[in-house]
Amino acid sequence: MDAVQQQTNSTSNIDSAKCQKLKRFVIVGLLITIGILSWHFYEYFHSKPLPKTPDDVLTLSKNLYAEETEVSPYLYKVNLQGKTTSGAHDDRAPRNLFELHQDLLARDANSTTALLMRLFDNYELDVAVQEHPTPEHVQEQYDFLRAVMGTRVMKLTMRFLVHKDIVSVEYDDQLRLLQELWFTPYSRGRGIVGSSSFEHVFMAEIRDQKVLGLHNWLYFADQEQRGNVDYKGWLNHKEMGKHNQMVLSVRYTFHNINKPVNGFFVGISPELDMALYTACFLATAKEEPCHIQLGHASATIVSHEWKWNGMRLIGTVYPDSS
């Protein structure tokens, strides 16, 4: 009898253990299911649909600015200081124009801002020096573009370009459009392939001791930190309405070369910068000004094309708020 009782107890213990294991399995499965359903409910109720596709860039720019749900967390302060003129040679701004949250930039490695700034050391400054893009550089280009393509700002822009029959609805076609438009290397003279739309607009170039481009506030801030830019004062600025956001024209020196006037947007995201420049260049008639509205600030985006191997690329594009 004792042997039978022990066997019965052993069987009962095994069944109890199996039951407990099954319960844990069911509970874990239920928790995972609830988590997945909760995420889908969150997405459904909290992700708003994109606004109706506009017919003109002016309306598009208003919609794009509305998608900038928050100001750049990386921009701590804008020090405008003294007003100047393009013909002046004195320094009316002893402090840097921008102060950044460097620690936050270091932590947010996958943000469009961090991915943009990762590209800043991939290029030769002098357009007379041949560019030699490495596989790593090309990968960093695609990492940045894919991140930009994932934003609501660029999704809305691409839908506008599809509406204008400029690009297809296919993701790969849209990615290719941005890659070719912004990152195709071309020559600005002497047959030396030492430039690109991206390098000119989002960074800066030097040709025959003249500063070209530099129409992105993040590159300006980066070069200030490195001691390559010396801000001399502002010529004109229009506030957009959100903290630290404006259309700004400035005077400065870059590598000790004077730049009497230069314009860029301040405090906006890389995707909004790229979206505005892309839409204006592709959807506006050749050499025609492109009128935009970002909050309280109205401006005109000026663009000039560069023909290269049968392609229509960006020679320059920048905002003018005067």
Curated annotation (Swiss-Prot):
Cofactor: Mn(2+)
GO biological process, one term: post-transcriptional gene silencing
E.C. numbers: 3.1.-.-, 4.6.1.-
Tissue: Predominantly expressed in head.
Listed transmembrane segments: 25-45
GO cellular component, one term: membrane
Null allele phenotype: RNAi-mediated knockdown is late pupal lethal. Conditional RNAi-mediated knockdown in pan-neuronal tissues or specifically in cholinergic neurons results in significant lifespan reduction with some individuals failing to eclose. Individuals that do survive to adulthood appear immature bearing unexpanded wings, soft cuticle, unretracted ptilinum, dimpled dorsal thorax, and misoriented scutellar bristles. Surviving adults also showed sever locomotor defects. Conditional RNAi-mediated knockdown in motor neurons results in some locomotor defects but only mild developmental or lifespan effects.
Active site per the UniProt annotation: H200, H215, K259
Subcellular location: Membrane
Domain EndoU: 53-322
Stored InterPro entries: ENDOU, EndoU-like, EndoU_C
Keywords: Endonuclease, Hydrolase, Lyase, Manganese, Membrane, Metal-binding, Nuclease, RNA-binding, Transmembrane, Transmembrane helix
Topology within the bilayer: Single-pass membrane protein
GO molecular function: lyase activity; metal ion binding; RNA binding; RNA endonuclease activity
Recorded catalytic activity of this chain's protein: a ribonucleotidyl-ribonucleotide-RNA = a 3'-end 2',3'-cyclophospho-ribonucleotide-RNA + a 5'-end dephospho-ribonucleoside-RNA
Family membership: Belongs to the ENDOU family.
Self-association and partners: Monomer.
Role according to the record: Endoribonuclease that cleaves single-stranded RNAs at uridylates and releases products that have 2'-3'-cyclic phosphate termini. Preferentially cleaves single stranded RNA at poly-U sites with CU, UC and AU sites cleaved less efficiently. May target mRNAs encoding proteins involved in lipid metabolism to regulate their expression. Regulates levels of TBPH protein, but not mRNA, by an as yet unknown mechanism. Important for neuronal development or function.
Name assigned to this protein: Uridylate-specific endoribonuclease EndoU
Encoding gene (name): EndoU
